[in-house]
Amino acid sequence: MLTCNDCSTWEQFVNYIKTRCSKTAFENWIAPIQVLEESREKIRLEIPNIFVQSYLLDNYKKDLCSFVPLDAEGNPALEFVVSEIKRSSPQIAASVTKPAVEVSEENKDFQLKLNGAYRFDNFIEGPSNQFVKSAALGIAARPGRSYNPLFIHGGVGLGKTHLLHAVGHYVREHHKNLRIHCITTEAFINDLVHHLRVKSIDKMKNFYRSLDLLLVDDIQFLQNRQNFEEEFCNTFETLIHLSKQIVVTSDKPPGQLKLSERIIARMEWGLVAHVGVPDLETRVAILQHKAEQKGLNIPNEIAFYIADHVYGNVRQLEGAINKLTAYCLLFNKPLTETTVRDTLKELFRTPSKQKVSVESILKSVATVFQVKIQDLKGTSRAKNVPLARQVAMYLAKTLITDSLVAIGAAFGKTHSTVLYACKTIEQKIEKDALLKNQISLCKNNIAIDSPQHFV
């Protein structure tokens, strides 16, 4: 055991581990942990999410026993407290260009077609994607042992594919013996059609079922393709049964996909995580990061000006930077607000005269809370539904001008039920940071359907 008279036992443990793990692992899993209270009997730690707790105990339990107090059973006497989501300015990890991973001859069939730019260390984190990034890191660190499958859903251009490929890179670098395959749903279907045509379907089945990690992008393209859906579901179930990790992305949560109940149930087995529309601070961080990659120096006030007008998704922000960079270089123009306005006027969103509707609110709330729209308008008391229904009523009262009676009618409720729901949510958001963040995500999503600026 290391000793240090000026260090607490936790600090001694951290200093010890820092020299024995990679910089990335330390920054992702150890550095975020904060000591709340330390005594001879136990240590109380604040962690950003439950994945950090699992990673710490799974990988460093023996080391912990050498430094921290132990309980009666000889286990580390640690108490974990999950911190509230903080809306601080997003941090940008330094982007490091890494060499392509070499694949041995025997694993050539499993060579990954991963985008080298999509890694965890250059994924811009903010309140809208903090949870899903932690989930992706958690399963990448412990494939097949955490949440399986991991189902990532969200709108176009919000980072789903980035996270999918980041999982692939991380697993390849930290679990070198695992067989990994990353594929789009369309490519899976084409692969299946090919093997059916040449009568080698068993070869395809053997390939997919020998994988340790399967990464599938855009599962929504499996809709209305019943025969292909059945084969995918069979492969899916086999891998899950063998504790092989699966990660799936989609533009909708499982319950909103037009797939069989069987496959929807399988998708919901593990963890369903939503990637939301980035808030203003996150959009600014993304813009500055993209501009830095292009060699464009973008002042804070210009970044905020662009982010305030381009707020649909990350691809639009990247397109804005590409257009600005080209314009400034070709015409030798300085980067001013006038230059930005003239160059990006086609991208800039203007407040719409279209009113927010109850339907757009229901769609957004259903996506964030992972429930069905019909349940929000019905009497279901299933998990998440009552709270989501109250949030939808609260947003309807807040964002549209209809009377309480009209809002109640849209939900099949009385005006007094709407009033009760609004008061309940107003009280809860004062104490519940997670709920407050979920409501913010709902508003961001509504803004995409009915572009307006919400305070």
Curated annotation (Swiss-Prot):
Keywords carried by this UniProt record: ATP-binding, Cytoplasm, DNA replication, DNA-binding, Lipid-binding, Nucleotide-binding
**Keyword field contains Nucleotide-binding:** yes
**Which Pfam families does the record cross-reference, listed alphabetically?**
Bac_DnaA, Bac_DnaA_C, DnaA_N, Hda_lid
Q: Region Domain IV, binds dsDNA: which residues? A: 329-455
> Mind telling me which GO cellular component terms the entry cites?
cytoplasm; plasma membrane
Any single GO molecular-function term of the entry would be: lipid binding
- Name the segments for region: Domain III, AAA+ region: 113-328
UniProt-annotated stretches for the region Domain I, interacts with DnaA modulators: 1-95
Where is this protein localized, as stated in its record?
Answer: Cytoplasm
Keyword Phosphoprotein assigned to the entry: answer is no
Give the source's domain of life in one word: Bacteria
Enumerate the Gene Ontology biological process terms: DNA replication initiation; regulation of DNA replication
Recorded hits in InterPro entries, A to Z, give:
AAA+_ATPase, Chromosome_initiator_DnaA, Chromosome_initiator_DnaA-like, Chromosome_initiator_DnaA_CS, DnaA_C, DnaA_dom, DnaA_N_dom, DnaA_N_sf
Q: Which stretches of sequence are listed as region Domain II? A: 96-112
Q: Can you tell me which family this protein belongs to?
A: Belongs to the DnaA family.
Tell me the subunit arrangement: Oligomerizes as a right-handed, spiral filament on DNA at oriC.
Supply the PANTHER family for this chain: CHROMOSOMAL REPLICATION INITIATOR PROTEIN DNAA (PTHR30050:SF2)
Q: What is this protein called?
A: Chromosomal replication initiator protein DnaA 2
Organism, by scientific name, is: Chlamydia muridarum (strain MoPn / Nigg)
* Primary gene name: dnaA2
